[in-house]
Amino acid sequence: MKSLNFLLVVLFSMSLFSCKEKEEAAKPQATAEEQLVPPIPSADIVADEFQISPTKDTVIYHKSGSVISVPKEAFLDEKGNVITTPVALKFRMFSNPLDIYLAGIPMNFTNENGEELVFESAGMFEINASNNGKAVQVNPNNKIKVDAVSFSDDSKFNRYNLDPKTNTWRELGKDEIKTATKKEELERLPEAPIPPKEAGKFAFQVTDNLNEEDKLKEYKDVWFEPIDGKKCGFSYTKDILVKDLKNGKYEVTFVPWGKIPDTAKTTCTCYLSFKDKAQYSKALRNYKKKYAGLISKIENKRKSIEEAWSNYDKKVKEYYQFMQRKEIEGLTGSRKIMRTLEVNQFGIVNLDYPHVYPKGAKVEASFVDENGKALNLKQVVLVEMGVNALYRYAKTIHFNPKSQNILWGLTEDNKLAYFTIEDFKALKARTGKVVFKMRVHPTELKTYDDIMNVLFRS
C-alpha cells in the first residue's frame, strides 16, 4: 500500500512538472545572453540620485532630457505597505551604442524559435529606488511615468523589461510617442505670485461710494497697475468688480450705467502696486519672506530644464555621429522626441526592435596589433553606423560590407583596440579566416569622453 501511495505521488509530481513545462513553453521569453558587467568600470554610465518625498507628487527633469513624474504613494515596502518616508530614486539613460557598451547591458537574446537576434534601441533607461538602504517596489496603483528622450519616432519599437533574477527580457507592448519643446517644458513650471509693483502712469484706485458698507475697502491702500500698460476704466460706474486670480493678478471690471464709447476698456488684468514708497518697501519685504522657498524651488527647476536641454543638444550631436541621419539634425535646440511609459518594475527598461545580425560578410577573426603581435581581446563589439545597436562577438564576426563599421575590444591590460571605418573599407575578405590588424591606444582610457574621442571623433 505504501508503494502504491509513493507511485501515485511520483506520477502526480511528474504530471505537475509536465503541465508547468507546457505552460512555460506556451509563453516564450527572449533570453539575455550576458550579465550586466561594465567592461570599463571607471567609464560606466553613473546614475543620478534624487531624494523623493513620497507624500507628494514630484516631477524630475533629468539631464538627459527625460522627464520622470512620480505620483505620491508611488513606493511599497517588501510587505506591500505604502512608504511615507524619504526615498532615494536613481535614474540613468542610455542613448547610443557606446552608452550601452560601457554599462555592460545585454543586447543579444534568443527568441522562441531559437534564433539569435540583437536589439536595435530607440532609448533605454535604468530606474531604481530604495528606502533606508532597502530596495522598494512599484505601487501598481500609483505608477511612475517616464517621458524617455529618444531620437526615433518609428513605431516599430516595443518595450522590454530586463528581469534581474532570470536575466530575461520580457516584452510589454508599445509606448506612446510624442514631441516636446523647451518652451512647453518651461511653461509647465508653476508660477510664483507676482511681486508688489510701484504704481505707474495708468495706475488707479477703486472705491465704493454707493453703499454704506464699502465692499472694496480691502483695496483702499493699493493701486491697480494694468499689465498691458494701457489706460483702463472710467469714473462714476454703476459697479466695480474685483476678482483675485490667485497668482498675483487681479481682474477689475467696470460696470457702466449706460452705453459707453467702444474705445473704453471695461475689464483689465492688473498687478497690485503702491505709490507710497514706504508701503511698497514693506510689501516687497513681506513678499520675499513669504515666497522665498517657492521662488527658489521654481528657479531650481528652471535651471534643471535649461541644463537638460543643453545636455540634450550634446547627446544629439553624439547620436548623429553614430547614426548620420538628416532627420536627427532637425532635433537640435528645437524639439525632442519623447516615448512615454509607466514603470511596472524597477530595473532596466528597453525600447527596442529585435533584428538579425548584419549580413554580407561572415569571417573567423583573430587579432594582432600594428606590429603583428597577437592580441587576446575581450568585450569585442561591432557598431554599424546608422543602426543604434551593439553587436557582441567572440570569434565569428558578421558585418555588412556596404555599411560603415567600427570594431573594438579590450586588450588583456585593458587598452582600447579598434578597427576603423577606413580599415573596414580596405578589408576585402568576406568569408574564411581574417586577421584584424588593430590600432591599440597607447594608454588605458578611463572616461566616456576619452573613449568617444578615439572611436568616433578622430
Task: Tell me the role of every PLM-derived stretch.
Residues 1-6, 20-21:
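Positively charged n-region of N-terminal signal peptides that target proteins for export
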Residues 15-18:
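C-terminal motif of bacterial Sec signal peptides marking the signal peptidase cleavage site
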Residues 20-23, 227, 341:
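Pro/Ser/Thr/Gly-rich intrinsically disordered low-complexity regions
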Residues 182-322:
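Long intrinsically disordered, low-complexity regions that are acidic and Ser/Thr-rich
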Residues 329-357, 417-458:
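Extracellular beta-sheet/turn segments enriched in Thr/Pro/Gly and aliphatic residues
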Residues 46, 70-71, 112-114, 129-194, ...:
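Proteolytic-maturation and junctional protease-sensitive modules
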Residues 23-68, 72-78, 83, 92-158, ...:
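Proteolytic processing hotspots in large secreted/extracellular or virion-associated proteins
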